[in-house]
């Protein structure tokens, strides 16, 4: 019976196949673990992206508000400067005009 080619390699072949199955199982377990880890990272990245998007929207809204406020302040300052210049010119020119009239 030991000379029969069909039976002589069966235990080694079965053991070899079982070892390969174990290796494939280990690889699949590692792949599943990596996949779950990548899923968690992608989920965290998605949360951070949503948060950054909200922050960007808020930042844009605040900058528009501040830009309007600064424009109004600038206009007020320019009007005050123009009024002061007109007042100074009036103070200087009115006495001169009154002398010649």
From Swiss-Prot:
Single GO molecular function: SNAP receptor activity
InterPro entries with a match to the protein in the record: Synaptobrevin-like, Synaptobrevin/VAMP, V_SNARE_CC
PROSITE patterns cross-referenced by the UniProt entry: V_SNARE
Main location class: membrane
GO cellular component, one term: transport vesicle membrane
Entries under Gene3D superfamilies matching the protein: 1.20.5.110
Topology, Vesicular side: 98-101
Any Pfam family the entry gives: Synaptobrevin
GO aspect biological process, one term: vesicle fusion
PANTHER family linked: SYNAPTOBREVIN FAMILY MEMBER (PTHR45701)
This protein's name: Synaptobrevin-B
Origin species: Dictyostelium discoideum (Social amoeba)
